[in-house]
Amino acid sequence: MSSSSAASIGPPQPPPPPAPPEEEKKCLNSELWHACAGPLVCLPTVGTRVVYFPQGHSEQVAASTNKEVEGHIPNYPNLPAQLICQLHDVTMHADVETDEVYAQMTLQPLNPQEQNDAYLPAEMGIMSKQPTNYFCKTLTASDTSTHGGFSVPRRAAERVFPPLDFTQQPPAQELIARDIHDIEWKFRHIFRGQPKRHLLTTGWSVFVSAKRLVAGDSVLFIWNEKNQLLLGIRRASRPQTVMPSSVLSSDSMHIGLLAAAAHAAATNSRFTIFYNPRASPSEFVIPLSKYIKAVFHTRISVGMRFRMLFETEESSVRRYMGTITEVSDADPVRWPSSYWRSVKVGWDESTAGERPPRVSLWEIEPLTTFPMYPSLFPLRVKHPWYSGVASLHDDSNALMWLRGVAGEGGFQSLNFQSPGIGSWGQQRLHPSLLSSDHDQYQAVVAAAAASQSGGYLKQQFLHLQQPMQSPQEHCNLNPLLQQQILQQASQQQIINPDAQNIQTMLSPSAIQQQLQQLQQMQQVQNDQKQKIQPDQSYQVPTSAVLPSPTSLPSHLREKFGFSDPNANSSSFITSSSSDNMLDSSFLQGSSKAVDLSRFNQPVASEQQQQQAWKQKFMGSQSVSFGGSVLHNSPTSKDGSVENKIGRDVQNQSLFSPQVDSSSLLYNMVPNLTSNVSDGNLSTIPSGSTYLQNAMYGCLDDSSGLLQNTGENDPATRTFVKVYKSGSVGRSLDITRFSNYAELREELGQMFGIKGQLDDPDRSGWQLVFVDRENDVLLLGDDPWESFVNSVWYIKILSPEDVHKMGKQGNDPRYLS
């Protein structure tokens, strides 16, 4: 050859690499070959070490011939279950008749001495070079009809095909596409019909007939970097009705591949194999580095959860979830101690019948190995960051993180992700919440439960709510409201199991007496001159007869304002709030008043309480206080109540102190998104993302603080926030898309990384999302509909972000 003669001229030079066959130069396009092979195909790099599995090679023969390995095929005891080989050559081919792609590999087993030599692992392999500008469509019956044409999706035609000239009527052009064998095919691309659509007409039926395409096969159109249109096909796997003659020699094929591998292992000679990615159930030539990582550096056990990539329709990829049920040899008789399909699994979804019952270690991704660290997301996590600081979700003591533990700084020591949140929280949270008064509150409750009168508690509530009262709101009580309260009270029953004091149903006469006392109290309260706007009126029905804390210590009685031991029963309290919702008076009063939950009196469900508090702080101006749902009732100019009390009160006790201060604060802080006056926002800079931190959850910027509750309700919101390091977060309407491929494409264009998100394994970029339970998951794990219903935020991780998270994997603060 010319290369050898050239090498003999001049000074000695290292011999050049052998030239590839001439037919490969003109026939195959690597990008098109990989696109036809599939998005999960990985060819090892020439010159690297690989692991060859004869057992997997036999599976490919069985799948190709539709005949399993029979027991009479001789076994080769000297052939190990896995051979460590040197990969000398990889050549891509395509069948001339069917266009099926396959690869030819030349392997050479390593002797024990070579296996012990120092070896620097190369990359995991050449991932499938999937094109960035392409579309794949499964053919329908009309697409394969000789009288019709090929219907192209609108977005696919606009993205892949050259633009049409819409000044023509109808718009049309001629397309020239090259297939895997470099043969040109001409099609007429036209935009017509009712409704109008993109069609390939002239030339399409010729292509279908020549390739013998049927419904279920797939075609791919690729617009490459050289501005060329490439065309490929994928045959649908279908059972063979007429067995080809090769079935008769299938046993010989099994024997032949085993004999060739055994001979090569014994003599350390080269041997050749063929890998068909569309027919083989799994890859049976694995890069050595990938094999070592999976076998020796991944811990698995029965019961462990995992995910696994599968190719879906139209060249998309999806992860399916499953559970490891057994770790054992797939064929302990013929292939003992083999890692091939050594993991028996159970799949989550009903489509598990299409998934293999056994997989190999390098095919799965245990959930514990993927780094999911909310430090990169401005989001709340479920578990505590420090071992001594309880989580916000810790129902046993949800205020622990505010008070600090074991000498730590508590609230001040938390490392907030958003600038300024620490100072904002310190300004708005009253110091009483940062102290350990829990035992003292318990003493108040215990003393009250042991007595017979509720006067002290009534006065305490009045004392706490005085800064929020308005004289104009106490003047008139709508007769309709009085009648409704009477009807509701006749259906209520207040029970105190802790103090063993049972109050029977209140009679109408008792309610009437309490209303009279209410009017007298309102007259007294009118004398209190306070400069508070009456724009937000929260009405609290409180007719519970609570015991009096006669045994309360004097210092506690003074601390909590129980100055009159002879105070009478409680009545109907009306208050308003125009001050800051997190003002010290409000939080101090709320924290002390609502801690009466130890009475365990029957109340509305927790869901009703949370919904009521959510409505108060997110725009509907209603509040759950003492277990009752209290709706804001706008007042007219004369002070009369215009609206009825909310329907949620009907099934609740008129006063039921069953709200825990911890749950109150938990439901209050994350939903502080609206109903805040302009004056209360003076300390919050415009355009800031103040509440984007791991404790409060991720709220939008200052404009989002004034949004309506309907826009922020998880059940109704369709816009999600997308974050990427170094870029401004953006909102995206998730309902615009119908699958993951469209979403990835849009995100790539939105952040200027087009094509990087289509193949995370090749590019290193990862897409993760946070669901409404604050779990961080890989995007693509769940069915599309489930993802749309559960997604809350999306995070784009660069390869640097993923690498950085891997280094922080042992830090408990980053565990989710």
UniProtKB/Swiss-Prot annotation:
Task: State the UniProt keywords alphabetically.
Answer: Auxin signaling pathway, DNA-binding, Nucleus, Transcription, Transcription regulation
Region of interest (Disordered), residue spans: 1-24, 526-565
A Pfam family assignment: AUX_IAA
- Subcellular compartments: Nucleus
One GO cellular component this record assigns the protein to is:
nucleus
Q: Where is the sequence biased in composition, kind Pro residues? A: 11-20
Start and end residues of each PB1 domain: 717-801
Q: Which residues bind DNA?
A: 135-237
Family annotation (PROSITE patterns): B3 (PS50863), PB1 (PS51745)
Q: Which GO terms describe its biological process?
A: auxin-activated signaling pathway; regulation of DNA-templated transcription
Provide a Gene Ontology MF annotation, just one: DNA binding
- Composition skew (Low complexity), residue ranges: 1-10
Q: What does this protein do?
A: Auxin response factors (ARFs) are transcriptional factors that bind specifically to the DNA sequence 5'-TGTCTC-3' found in the auxin-responsive promoter elements (AuxREs).
Q: What is known of its domains?
A: Interactions between auxin response factors (ARFs) and Aux/IAA proteins occur through their C-terminal dimerization domains III and IV.
Query: Quaternary structure per UniProt?
Result: Homodimers and heterodimers.
Q: What protein family is recorded?
A: Belongs to the ARF family.
User: What is the name listed in the Swiss-Prot or TrEMBL entry for this protein?
Assistant: Auxin response factor 12
Protein's organism = Oryza sativa subsp. indica (Rice)
